Swiss-Prot record:
Source domain of life: Bacteria
Protein name: Aspartate--tRNA ligase
EC number: 6.1.1.12
Chain segments carrying region Aspartate: 195-198
Gene that produces this protein: aspS
Catalyzed chemical reaction(s): tRNA(Asp) + L-aspartate + ATP = L-aspartyl-tRNA(Asp) + AMP + diphosphate
Function, in words: Catalyzes the attachment of L-aspartate to tRNA(Asp) in a two-step reaction: L-aspartate is first activated by ATP to form Asp-AMP and then transferred to the acceptor end of tRNA(Asp).
Organism (species): Salmonella typhimurium (strain LT2 / SGSC1412 / ATCC 700720)
GO biological process: aspartyl-tRNA aminoacylation
InterPro entries found in the cross-reference section: Aa-tRNA-synt_II, aa-tRNA-synth_II, aa-tRNA-synth_II/BPL/LPL, Asp-tRNA-ligase_1, Asp-tRNA-ligase_1_N, Asp/Asn-tRNA-synth_IIb, AspRS_core, GAD-like_sf
């Protein structure tokens, strides 16, 4: 039906007769002439109808936005004064000789001239996706997946599919369950990741695996999370963690070079402990120049319990955050930031305004100045590198509260005061995560997942001192987003059972949930390691949007609902009966 795409016409097509198919993006009726901007997935071109083609002109008068049409005409160069430098096709136009209205459009529920609500955009997603910026994002996503496949193929990885209907295993979030009709009362689980299957593939001898795969997690959603999402899933045998990172870093550098024309360079490597200490986060945004600086040793003897208490507590921390130019902040702004850090458990926000650095104690303004000596102030200013006009904020509490509160404040100030370089790319690897973390109930939970191997520990050593164990794990972070994470896996049955035991999974439960894995570990399991990237998040970064729903064709809301299809929906009674399921209705309040 078409010979060319609208958005691909250029000066090289001048004089050619073309047939285009697409939609009316805009129409301008000048009486004797009618102009339309005609759109398809590749872009927009100007088409005009003149009196010499009376039939086409007459039919064009009926056109309205979003009519689906076919146009045949001749490509012409525009006069110099009419060239539109803002359009890729702005040097040419198409003189229409014939027009076919394939389908008319009713009055549109979305307004192209205004910002539509996200609710309306999701309800009429098929119209929203016609917008050039949305089409471009999905085209970029398609390019990314194509580049990934070619790269992985070139590096000897095999694309192998794993099951969608599998067994529920504890991986941190709730599973989506699928009832079995054949096995009444039993359920499959949709995979949160192909984790165990890709490990089993390593045990099967397929030493380089990858898959672009859907995953499902029934968890409380955030703005950058979806109940179903896509992973670039990777696993290798006989490769060390640095070797895995080297190949995966090369993949991401390849993507940025091909999609953005940007060379990311070599990625720095930082330990989890250093990231938390310097940035208050395990996914630091290195575009932001501010860092947390420990000052507890300077404040142990001050007569101010808010500082002295944590400074003398082995589990406490006192840290300072220097804000360049922050002395300009008003009292109201400071109070607002004080309320902000309370969200993260902080009790308040002490500060020092540096007016004249050279004057020491006399050159600052601070509500806690009366508790500080001139020597202490000088030491704080020296350690933080403070200059005239800076602000120093303090966090004093346990380690977690200080890191969380000042880490979040650092990001907010970076944005509010334009200190974060939005034009920069700042990738890094974060390694050496804790193996376990406190579950809040006196036990331990895996920081990544139960199949991650510890660094340099035997099973007996791990069993004796699990709290201090370091995981052989690694996350890739770009501009403050965790885009991928992985680890070296446990390939020894004794170690795997030890980890299960530390997590409170008894032997009977181990057999019930992971018997197939424990059996497989008995038969010559190779050392293996892997990683998974979030394709949605990678695409979000590469397309410059901050909303993950912008890079998914048909996303869910933060309530895990599809406004277009109205999923989830009630199942009919016959289907439930066949599955042996009875829905229990909540009692209504009287």
């Amino acid at each position: 039906m078409r010979t060319e795409y609208c958005g691909q016409l250029r000066l090289s097509h001048v004089g050619q007769q073309v047939t285009l198919c697409g939609w009316v993006n805009r129409r301008r009726d000048l009486g004797s002439l009618i102009f339309i901007d005609m759109r398809d997935r590749e872009g927009i071109v100007q088409v005009f109808f003149d009196p010499d083609r009376a039939d086409a002109l007459k039919l064009a008068s009926e056109l309205r936005n979003e009519f689906c049409i076919q146009v045949t005409g001749t490509v012409r160069a525009r006069d110099a004064k009419n060239v539109n430098a803002d359009m890729a096709t702005g040097e040419i136009e198409v003189l229409a000789s014939s027009l076919t209205i394939i389908n008319r459009a009713d009055s549109l529920p979305l307004d192209a001239n205004h910002v539509n609500t996200e609710e309306a955009r999701l309800k009429y997603r098929y119209l929203d996706l016609r917008r050039p910026e949305m089409a471009q994002r999905l085209k970029t996503r398609a390019k990314i997946t194509s580049l990934v496949r070619r790269f992985m193929d070139d590096h000897g990885f095999l694309d192998i599919e794993t099951p969608m209907l599998t067994k529920a295993t504890p991986e941190g979030a709730r599973d989506y369950l699928v009832p079995s009709r054949v096995h009444k009362g039993k359920f499959y689980a949709l995979p949160q990741s192909p984790q165990l299957f890709k490990q089993l593939l390593m045990m099967s001898g397929f030493d380089r695996y990858y898959q672009i795969v859907k995953c499902f997690r029934d968890e409380d959603l955030r703005a950058d999370r979806q109940p179903e999402f896509t992973q670039i899933d990777v696993e290798t045998s006989f490769m060390t963690a640095p070797q895995v990172r080297e190949v995966m870093e090369a993949l991401v550098r390849h993507l940025w070079l091909e999609v953005k024309g940007v060379d990311l360079g070599d990625f720095p490597v930082m330990t989890f402990a250093e990231a938390e200490r310097r940035y208050g986060s395990d996914k630091p945004d290195l575009r932001n120049p501010m860092e947390l600086v420990d000052v507890a040793d300077l404040l142990k003897s001050v007569e101010f319990a808010v500082f002295a208490g944590p400074a003398n507590d082995p589990k406490g921390r006192v840290a300072a955050l220097r804000v360049p130019g922050g002395a300009q902040l008003s009292r109201k702004q400071i109070d607002d930031y004080g309320n902000f850090v309370k969200i993260y458990g902080a009790k308040g926000l002490a500060y020092i305004k540096v007016n004249e650095r050279a004057k020491g104690l006399d050159g600052i303004n601070s509500p806690v100045a009366k508790f500080l000596t001139a020597d202490i102030v000088e030491a704080i200013l020296e350690r933080t590198g403070a200059q005239d006009g800076d602000m120093i904020f303090f966090g004093a509490d346990n380690n977690k509260v200080v890191a969380d509160a000042l880490g979040a404040l650092r990001l907010k100030l970076g944005k509010d005061l334009s200190l974060t370089d939005e034009d920069k790319w700042a990738p890094l690897w974060v390694i050496d995560f804790p193996m376990f973390e406190d579950d809040g109930e006196g036990g331990l939970t895996a920081m990544h997942h139960p199949f991650t191997a510890p660094r340099d520990m035997t099973a007996s050593e791990l069993k004796t001192a699990p709290e201090g164990a370091v995981a052989n794990a690694y996350d890739m972070v770009i501009n403050g987003y965790e885009v991928g994470g992985g680890s070296v896996r446990i390939h020894n049955g004794e170690m795997q059972q030890t980890v299960f035991g530390i997590l409170g999974i008894n032997e009977q439960e181990q057999r019930e949930k992971f018997g197939f894995l424990l059996d497989a570990l008995k038969y010559g399991t190779p050392p293996h390691a892997g990683l998974a990237f979030g394709l949605d998040r990678l695409t979000m970064l590469l397309t410059g949007t901050d909303n993950i729903r912008d890079v998914i064709a048909f996303p869910k809301t933060t309530a895990a609902a599809c406004l277009m299809t109205e999923a989830p929906s009630f199942a009919n009674l016959a289907a439930l009966t066949e599955l042996g399921i009875q829905v229990v209705k909540k009692a209504e309040n009287n």
